[in-house]
């Protein structure tokens, strides 16, 4: 029988995160670190680059594969779940401000508003937020994990 996917040369299995391990190993290891260092009863909130549903850019990859809540998920899904974009738009703007603002007090206020414990900075965030200055995150928190190009900052409380 012909397959929509063409001639499959190798068996991929059902491990849905395998591609991430191959394509974005730093993100993959960050997800494993989060799973090992958080508990289901006290899940922290993370902030990461948000995006569109099923995006080839792989936004929201940390929250999607770790199960840890994020400030905003895929925009269209969030919109459909809530029945309005009025909730989605301000959250997307807040995420942009976290990554692009130079005003540390503003960033702290937004992080507190959502109870963010971890800030993700990887390839996706660097590509999307052109004016991102990572030094500010070292000022408002500490690096708790780093693998390859992915850094996880824990927000100081």
What are these regions (language model features)?
Residues 1-157:
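Extracytoplasmic
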């Amino acid at each position: 029988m012909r397959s929509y996917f063409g001639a499959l040369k190798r068996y991929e299995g059902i491990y849905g995160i395998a591609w991430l391990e191959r394509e974005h190993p730093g993100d993959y290891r960050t997800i494993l670190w989060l799973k090992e260092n958080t508990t289901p009863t006290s899940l922290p909130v993370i902030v990461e680059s948000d995006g569109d549903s099923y995006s080839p850019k792989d936004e929201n990859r940390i929250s999607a594969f770790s199960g840890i809540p994020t400030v905003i998920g895929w925009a269209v899904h969030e919109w459909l779940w809530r029945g309005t974009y009025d909730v989605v738009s301000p959250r997307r703007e807040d995420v942009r401000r976290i990554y692009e603002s130079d005003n540390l007090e503003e960033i702290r206020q937004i992080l507190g508003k959502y109870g963010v414990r971890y800030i993700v900075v990887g390839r996706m965030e660097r590509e999307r937020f052109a004016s991102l200055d990572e030094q500010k995150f070292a000022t408002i928190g500490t690096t708790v994990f780093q693998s390859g190009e992915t850094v996880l900052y824990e927000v100081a409380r």
